[in-house]
Every structure is written in C-alpha cells, then in structure tokens.
Amino acid sequence: MLQIAICDDEQYYRKKIQTLLTQYFYHKDLEYSIQSYPSGEVFLSQRENSVKYDIVFMDISMKELDGIQTASQIRAFHSDTQLVFVTAFIDYALEGYKVNAVRYIMKDTLDTAIPECMDAILHKMRLAQVRFSFIDGDATLYTDNILYIE
C-alpha cells in the first residue's frame, strides 16, 4: 500500500490534491492511504509515529516552516521518499533541486500535472523493486531497503 502525505497550508489545495489522487488511484486500481497536514510543523510532529511516506506533496510557501525546510528534514530520515513540490510561485523552482524533488507542479496546472507526475513516480518506484520468493511466500522489496540476503 502506498503511503502518501499532502502538506499545504491552504485547505482548498489539500482537498484538490487528495481528490485528484483518489481519482487517479481509482483508475489504476492501487491501494493507497492519504494523510493531509496543514503545515510543515504538524507534518514533522507526526514523525514520532514512524510513518514513512512513499510520496509527499508539499507546498513551498507556508508560514513559519516552509516546504524546502520541511523537505530537508524529511530527507534526513527518508532518502527514498518521492517529494513533489506544489506551489503558486515559480520563483522557488531551483530550491527543489537541493532536496532532490521529483517534480515541481504549479497549482494552476494540478488537473493535468498530477496524473503525469504519478505515472512517472510509479514507474520509478517499480524499477526499484524486486520480487523474492521466501518459505512463507512471495514478497516485493525495494532494492534500497535490502542490506543483506542469505
């Protein structure tokens, strides 16, 4: 199951992104879970719950702790999380490279950009997975999570 987080200080965009993702996953028949957060501070406070998100949609321009600062802290704990910046301002696009964001989406293009973005992310994630057969059954693992096989 894909774990997805949306972090935006505007409720309208949190709901819009969630609706677009729900529509996307309905057509792909994939299992997913979406959590929404109104700020970087609230998002990071949930880190104590040990939730590791596969994909995070992050607004850049937020009060107090902005999206770049929040993403930097996410990267410190989860280097393989797929970060997508969603913003109304093109000015910060280059900042996304500092935290290895996979996409930088303008809010006025969400309807067309989200499906393309998700296709690219899922393709990238599938390339990083390997299926193994164990005594207890089969399992698909991310190659980045494999430390040792005996």
Model-derived segments and spans:
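Short, well-ordered amphipathic alpha-helices
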Residues: R14-Y24, F43-L44, A71
